[in-house]
Amino acid sequence: APAESNPGNYHGVSKFDLTGIPDPEVAPAESFSNAFGRTLSAAGNTDKTLCAITAAMKYGTGLQFFSHAHPERFFDVGMAEQHAVTFAAGLASKGMLPVVCIYSTFLQRSYDQIIHDVNLLHENVVFAVDRAGFVPGDGETHQGIYDPAFLSQTGMPIYSPSNYEELRHWLPILLSHEMQGPRAIRYPRGGESKALAKYGCSGKEYDKLI
């Protein structure tokens, strides 16, 4: 069956042919998740300490690129967000640079671990917060509206790129070993706003949109 042979793509589906006849392949539109995933995978080519952790959200967070390129440094712990964060803290304590990629609404499950296992110990863990902000199409359970509150912790910067250019600029900086301690980057589901793509910043200049 198509869903059994390709469970990732059938995790969440729109309308499709019930007979299983595949539609003509169409190149998927770019998204924040895929822009993140490609940038992270490219960084993994040169930094062998870089690893990615998710909780049953490989395709949703764009980690299929990293998992294919660096399978030995990709970890899917299943639906266990608390364990994902504690596992990341352990890897960081041994010199690795773990990137925890979880939807905003599910990352709140690991609030205690973020504080006690990562931040209080000042471990080098990067949190990639997908589905941040209002999330269309996924229903009430997937709204990412609380992470600005529970990630606002002492010594933990939060980056929120408004377009792909900003994401590609800031992510390598967050992955630099010159940064110390936990840090987070949050981005919405789907694609960038055309207005923000036009007026977004390069990291050196900031524009105010009204």
Features from the language model and the residues they span:
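Thiamine diphosphate
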Residues: 1-182, 191-193, 203-205
